[in-house]
Amino acid sequence: MKVVAVLGSPRPQGGSSTLARRVLDGARAAGHEVVVYEISKMNVRGCQACRTCKDNLVDCVQEDDLQPYWKDLHECGALVVSACNYCSMVNGPMITYMNRHYCLIGGDNRVRVHPGIKLVGVFSQGNPDPNRIAHVYDWFLRDFQNRDMVLVDKLVHSARWPQEQIDALLERAYQIGLNL
């Protein structure tokens, strides 16, 4: 199975990236093919509301660094999305990425990606309470669930946790990847 990961943190060694990469380690150990996109290193434009996707039932036609992603998304069995938290919100580049999935709902309101893609959300925040802004993460993930993806798990990390709590979360992340 192909596992596509979209990492949203501008810090490759940051909490959300580290945790997401641990999920991917588990996926690789299970024999899955892994494709990684790092949004902070990509030229990704926001949706321009051109409606080409709706009128022609095609993936987004914008010529930016997301072009290869659409093919990978249609081929994958799992999608891992990770984001850091800025000011109690998913970081901006990941919201832009999320909005681009507008193209996956046709003009007839049918989802244009195969149903059942497994979805894993990985988030990092400064607040030690993982439930403090869970509603924000749920809002973000719901956009993917509205495209018939199935949420497998949601991981929330805080750098303020003791190391043993972080280690347990890293092990949980690995197991999630292993069991995709």
Model-found features: residue ranges?
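Short glycine-rich anion-binding loops that position phosphate/pyrophosphate groups of nucleotides
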Residues: 85-87, 126-127
